[in-house]
Regions:
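Short, helix-capping/interhelical loops that line the mouth of catalytic, cofactor-
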Residues: 24-29, 78-133, 140-141
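C-terminal segment of N-terminal export signals and the immediately downstream linker at the start
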Residues: 23-57
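Short, contiguous alpha-helical
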Residues: 51-101, 142-143, 147-180
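Residues within well-ordered alpha-helical secondary structure of globular protein domains
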Residues: 12-15, 47, 71, 178
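Amphipathic, well-ordered alpha-helical segments in soluble domains
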Residues: 16, 38-44, 68, 72, ...
């Protein structure tokens, strides 16, 4: 194995181990939802938005969370405001995506905004946020143009991007539950 390949392998292995360890951490409510397409993820967003009350283990409201997820989809079509360096996207970022895709779910800091994205008011009305998420998903599914590189994962084709979006939404919505 060449030094460059060995380095890439070690970086990717370390990231994979860290990502798997994060999934095992006890961080309160985590339903561990898993979606690979946008349809079921949107269905869960609708279900939660219709609940009379929610329990959550995140700092963000459901409205703010849905806008954050919509931003990610929008940025995949029009470009992310800030990106990690190319070396990061091609090594650690690509490795993280591969681990998440292999597991069928992702984990990340649920209170970290997309780098450079406009701030999201926590009081964002859930109905408006859901409408924005649905519009973003519909636009993404109809999108015929080139997709922009993900700020961390780098270049993804449409199928991989849809899976990334679905896993992203699932990770966030896993931390909300409708109260009876």
């Amino acid at each position: 194995m060449s030094p460059l390949n060995r380095r890439r392998f070690l970086q990717t292995s370390a990231l994979g181990t860290a990502a798997l360890g994060t999934a095992c951490a006890d961080n309160g409510l985590d339903r561990q939802l898993s979606y690979t397409t946008l349809g079921p993820a949107l269905e869960e967003a609708i279900r939660l938005s219709e609940a009379s009350a929610l329990a959550s283990s995140t700092r963000w409201s459901l409205g703010a969370t849905l806008v954050h997820c919509a931003q990610s989809i929008e940025f995949s079509m029009f470009g992310f405001p800030q990106a990690k360096p190319a070396w990061f996207q091609q090594t650690l970022g690509a490795g993280a995506y591969q681990v998440f895709a292999w597991r069928g779910r992702m984990t990340h800091d649920l209170a970290e905004p997309i780098p450079g994205a406009p701030a999201i008011p926590d009081a964002t009305p859930t109905s408006q946020a859901l409408a924005r998420l649905q519009q973003a998903a519909t636009a993404f599914q109809a999108w015929q143009g080139a997709l922009m590189p993900h700020f961390a994962y780098g270049a993804l084709d449409k199928t991989a991007y849809e899976q990334a979006h679905a896993m992203h939404i699932a990770n966030h919505l896993s931390h909300f539950i409708a109260k009876a």
